[in-house]
């Protein structure tokens, strides 16, 4: 019984530390998203993981914005997941907190996420927008909005829960998995 109490106490302390850390983070201060919403929404959690990996840049003067909506014409908008502004330029992050296998070609509008369904069952396949094209649109809209030239860098961040199986690139684009210190 004492061991169970001790385990529950340790779990409670860890949860409180994570909660307080989140509530004091720039991510929370900017988005106002509740802690449980961040932990239960896969997309929001991916954005928060990007911020956690980059938050040390705040000490060097970097500023962060999240879920930035920009006009793209005809009354429509496009959303940047994470924007980091620093002395080197502006970094535009597209977060893909996916699992499974990822297949894509830089030239194709849609990419595929393949999720295994168990032995003997076909994989479930989901289509999603090409993140390279998405970020090109974000950067074009950001340039039009700013009306000045700034160095802008595109970063596509996939979670460590997925495997980039076949990604075909034609331009000088590099990719890597974003490694968070904590997994789901």
What would you call each of these model-derived segments?
Residues 70-71, 158-164:
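Short, internal active-site loops enriched in acidic
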Residues 176-183:
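Conserved small/polar residues in nucleotide/adenosyl-binding loops
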Residues 55-75:
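A short acidic/basic microdomain associated with nuclease active sites
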Residues 32-49, 127:
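A short, highly charged nucleic-acid-interacting micro-segment common to nuclease
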Residues 96-157:
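Catalytic cores of nucleic-acid endonucleases
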């Amino acid at each position: 019984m004492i061991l169970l109490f001790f385990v529950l106490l340790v779990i409670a302390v860890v949860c409180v530390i994570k909660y307080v850390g989140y509530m004091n983070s720039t991510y929370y201060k900017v988005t106002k998203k509740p802690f449980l919403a961040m932990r239960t929404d896969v997309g929001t959690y991916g954005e928060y993981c990007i911020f956690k990996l980059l938050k040390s840049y705040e000490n060097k003067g970097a500023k962060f914005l999240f879920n930035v909506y920009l006009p793209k014409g005809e009354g429509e908008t496009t959303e940047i997941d994470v924007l980091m502004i620093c002395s080197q330029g502006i970094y535009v992050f597209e977060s893909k907190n996916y699992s499974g296998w990822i297949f894509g070609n830089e030239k194709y509008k849609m990419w595929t996420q393949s999720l295994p369904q168990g032995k003997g069952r076909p994989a479930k396949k989901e289509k999603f927008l090409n993140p390279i094209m998405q970020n090109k649109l974000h950067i074009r809209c950001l340039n039009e909005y700013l009306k000045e030239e700034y160095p802008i860098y595109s970063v596509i961040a996939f979670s460590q829960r997925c495997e980039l199986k076949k990604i075909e690139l034609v331009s000088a684009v590099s990719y890597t998995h974003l490694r968070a210190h904590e997994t789901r």
